[in-house]
Amino acid sequence: MMLMDTSLIGAINLTIHAFLVGSLLLGLHRKIMARIQGRPGPPIIQYLLHTLKFYVKEITFPITAGNPLYIFVALLDIAIWLAALIIAIDFKSSLLIIIGIYVLQKIVEHGCGLSSGSPYGKIGGVRSVFSAAAEVPLFAVVAAIYLTTHSVLISDILSYQEIHGSLLFKMPICAFAFFILLVSKAPNSPFGIVKGKDIVSGYMTEHYGLLGAIIYIAEAIAYFVLLWLFIAVFIGPLVINSPVLTLAVMVVMTVILAFVNGLTPLLAPHHSVMLQMTIAGLVLCDVLYRLIVGG
């Protein structure tokens, strides 16, 4: 019982840490993008303030909403990323499980859009199906990592890098493909077709109040998890074993992502899909090469 209580407290602490760090990094991302565009921008704590603002607002339901699904998708969203957080960082389990959980995010995006009854939400939900092309390179990346490290467990990948060095320079194409995933998940991404400005907030347009706060919390945790995964898988234990170094690298990566997103226009849905499928093709070529040469 004591061990279970300790594990529960540890999971709660990890969740709070991930939310706070993810929120501040998203706030930094927004601040840098504003400076790039010649604006002073909001304070770095703006994402936290937005979350708190939605949290205290009254819950109302659009008259066109399908209430059971409308509520369920928000709860599913945070459940998905809490599971990813615990499985990745606490258990250091399989990358395949993490990617499987990540793919479930498309159900949330599609469900959010369709459940509200809003035309903007519906378009965002439909676009989420197109954006599933971003997941194709992920499976190829995992295949390439397995051929190199002979494991898909995060703990084994970290152990491999302790002996053989970082995978960042051994697998640059795979690292680039994963980086594109980070770009697609960051705010105002050129690949952000599901929440493009032309459809207001996309699938999130009609979610506000407590449900909106839940989605904001989930997005902050998601951003933290994906940054952590990139650092763990491609940079290795030299950084990931130090919380200070991990945070520093997350800040650097957020700055890079902000510059990429701030200087790149939003792609049309078909251009976004074509580009990400091209990246998937490059990773598949890398996988075939590793199969031929033996890892």
Swiss-Prot record:
It holds the Pfam family NADHdh. The chain crosses the membrane at residues 8-28, 69-89, 129-149, 163-183, 199-219, 220-240, 243-263, 273-293. It is a multi-pass membrane protein. Its EC number is 7.1.1.2. It is found in: Cell membrane. One of its GO terms (biological process) is anaerobic electron transport chain. This is Putative NADH-ubiquinone oxidoreductase MJ0520. It comes from Methanocaldococcus jannaschii (strain ATCC 43067 / DSM 2661 / JAL-1 / JCM 10045 / NBRC 100440). The lineage of its organism: Archaea, Methanobacteriati, Methanobacteriota, Methanomada group, Methanococci.
